[in-house]
Swiss-Prot record:
Radical SAM core domain residues: 11-236
Amino acids binding GTP: 20, 69, 100, 161, 265-267
Gene3D superfamilies: Aldolase class I
The encoding gene: moaA
Domain of life, per lineage: Bacteria
Binding-site list for S-adenosyl-L-methionine: 33, 73, 124, 195
Bound cofactor: record note: Binds 2 [4Fe-4S] clusters. Binds 1 [4Fe-4S] cluster coordinated with 3 cysteines and an exchangeable S-adenosyl-L-methionine and 1 [4Fe-4S] cluster coordinated with 3 cysteines and the GTP-derived substrate.
Enzyme class, spelled out: lyase
GO biological process: Mo-molybdopterin cofactor biosynthetic process
PROSITE patterns, per the entry: MOAA_NIFB_PQQE, RADICAL_SAM
The protein's name: GTP 3',8-cyclase
Length: 334
């Protein structure tokens, strides 16, 4: 990777070159680990406009960011999202523009997103059972999501990745089937330990926790897992399958194998808070900077640079412990 003299370096000498941007807190699903069933969403005036989102993206790319991931809520329910993708994708120096989606809108938007310059998709898929999928998402239609997954492949997306949050007693018996689903479609799949964000009522996190080591041990009974050194510039650790050359299995393990030492990313909430760590509340209000100093990229750049001293070395998630972070995942950016 080329060095940029303006690159963002935090207090622990970690280069920050990956920005996760939430473009909306709204979603057409109500996943049990992500938000409350009666979630109250932000009024429009409190969220960043598409132009403000672009201005932040432009500044980060100018400061050496090489990967941007658009998240939500569900990013595809934000009006104007395809046009925003096209503008961000065209920024000189950006290598990857990725998106995390629940897949519900990909049937109609996969091709426009690909044409706009989105390079990769992550699609959430927590169950292959229609009823269980509905229970976990509260409102989701499995057939619609599968159609969206297939539409992404037809549109030309490569290395599409499925994301599965593993909940013991709810979907952990589907692990092998989910991998086989990924193999059949030549997709990658990542299993994620649930992150303790927001107070939920659907399950007890301590009881539903399933570690990445346990998931890997179960999969090893059916597949030959070969550890890989490949990276997607994010927190996932990957294994290849001897049985399937075109599928990788990844693990994101915030509890059992935290990835803080090599953290290269920050998050922008749709409210304009620049979060320096997923598991801490250290943040800077970029919305205030954008609105108090419109059309002043130097002030925005200074705020971004000054924020880095707030980035902690690590989070301190605890399985089953008292919730320390009250914001839900949809407010953070999944």
């Amino acid at each position: 990777m080329e060095q940029n003299s303006r690159a963002l370096i935090d207090g622990f000498n970690r280069k920050i070159d990956y920005l996760r941007m939430s473009v909306t807190d709204r979603c057409d699903f109500r996943c049990v680990y992500c938000m409350a069933e009666d979630m109250q969403f932000l009024p429009r005036q409190q969220i960043l406009s598409l132009e403000e989102l672009f201005q932040v993206a432009e500044r980060f790319v100018a400061l050496g960011t090489r990967k941007i991931r658009l998240t939500g809520g569900e990013p595809l329910v934000r009006q104007g999202i395809v046009e925003l993708c096209g503008r961000i994708a065209a920024l000189p120096g950006l290598r990857e523009l990725c998106m995390t989606s629940n897949g519900s809108q990909l049937g109609r938007l996969a091709q426009p997103l690909f044409d706009a310059g989105v390079t990769r998709l992550n699609i959430s898929l927590d169950s292959l059972d229609t009823d269980r999928f509905k229970q976990l998402t509260r409102t989701g239609d499995l057939a619609q999501v599968v159609a969206g997954i297939d539409a992404a492949r037809q549109a030309g997306f490569k290395r599409t990745k499925l994301n599965c949050v593993v909940l013991k007693g709810r979907n952990d018996h589907e692990l092998v089937d989910l991998v086989r689903f990924a193999i059949d479609r030549e997709l990658d799949i990542t299993f994620i330990e649930e992150m303790p964000l927001g107070t939920i009522s659907e399950h007890e996190r301590g009881e539903s926790f399933c570690s990445s080591d346990e998931v890997r041990e179960r999969l090893a009974g059916q597949f030959t897992l070969i550890e890989s050194t490949e990276s997607s510039q994010g927190p996932a650790r990957y294994w290849r399958l001897a049985e399937a050359a075109n599928t990788r299995v990844g693990f994101i393990s915030p509890h059992s194998h935290n990835f803080c030492a090599t953290c290269n990313r920050v998050r922008l909430t749709v409210e304009g808070r620049l979060l320096l760590c997923l598991g801490n509340e250290h943040s800077v209000d970029l919305k205030h900077v954008l609105r108090a100093h419109p059309g002043n990229p130097e002030r925005l750049e200074k705020a971004i640079r000054d924020s880095l001293h707030l980035k902690p070395y690590r989070h301190h998630f605890e399985v089953g412990g008292e919730v320390q972070i009250l914001r839900f995942m949809n407010m953070t950016g999944g």
